[in-house]
């Protein structure tokens, strides 16, 4: 009988991650079947999506509260199906607020519940690890310091590395990126990444534009690249430019192309998030910044454990790149921090060395290692050839 795996992936990033995992499992167990909540990339791998993963996309606490009844209903319906169909295993990909409850119920029903992508318990709300220990059969972690946290709590855990480290080259081709973007090799370039969400562009757009204007006064030859992934964020940034007379800035908006923009840049101004990790894997000097509502910032600060918010600093356990958050996020301070990377090649070279070491530590062939951690829970695992993985 073919092994069956139920899965839930939240949002587009989870859809991509899960699709790679499905492919890696199928390479070892060709007749494996998958069903649950997923997106188009999972469906392209033969996944039976009973609900689309876009339904799980919530933006902030207010949206989550408004949609609680809808999401709770979907979760209960899926749980009923899993209990009835009894797959060999369940894999929750990210979306911890949705998946951990589900995983606890599924584990209690005697079905292995695996969670792929550890919640950021090392950054805030560390008490969640008790709930995780009750809810999951195994945790698959992306960062090398995470397994120790789970081992101390008695949670079976596997370190699988980060998929971006597999995708990004160890030595980015800056010249090729500049050629694709039609930028002269000798020109100074700063990439501005104010975030992927509309709320982030609203909060940070004008700040980034004012910072660019200040830096352009000091370095008239600089070119600013602003990659924006959606029409909505592009319109918001264009409106901010118009309000701040940004038409005179040497600035080019790109539709997507964030990786090319960062690869081509001498320095990056980036909102805290996954983009900061991408910049580190591309070995780019950066300044990390963020602004949010005052009450939200106070709440986050009270619940946080680490002195840093950016993944590069957290992963290196050191303040390698400047972080200017909330009241410290001002155009003069941001311009000063960016300028350092434009005029100090020795500091940039030292940073490249540290980021290269980080890249090596995260490059683990994530999909294969994750698949190897899942295979022992499948009914046909005895007949497949798992890739060796350290737990």
Swiss-Prot record:
Keyword Glycosyltransferase attributed: yes
Protein name: Lipid-A-disaccharide synthase
Pathway named in the protein's UniProt entry: Bacterial outer membrane biogenesis; LPS lipid A biosynthesis
Sequence intervals crossing the membrane: none
Domain of life: Bacteria
InterPro entries: Glyco_trans_19
Annotated GO CC locations: membrane
Coiled-coil boundaries: none
Catalysed conversion reaction: a lipid X + a UDP-2-N,3-O-bis[(3R)-3-hydroxyacyl]-alpha-D-glucosamine = a lipid A disaccharide + UDP + H(+)
PANTHER family the record matches: LIPID-A-DISACCHARIDE SYNTHASE, LIPID-A-DISACCHARIDE SYNTHASE, MITOCHONDRIAL-RELATED
Pfam family, one: LpxB
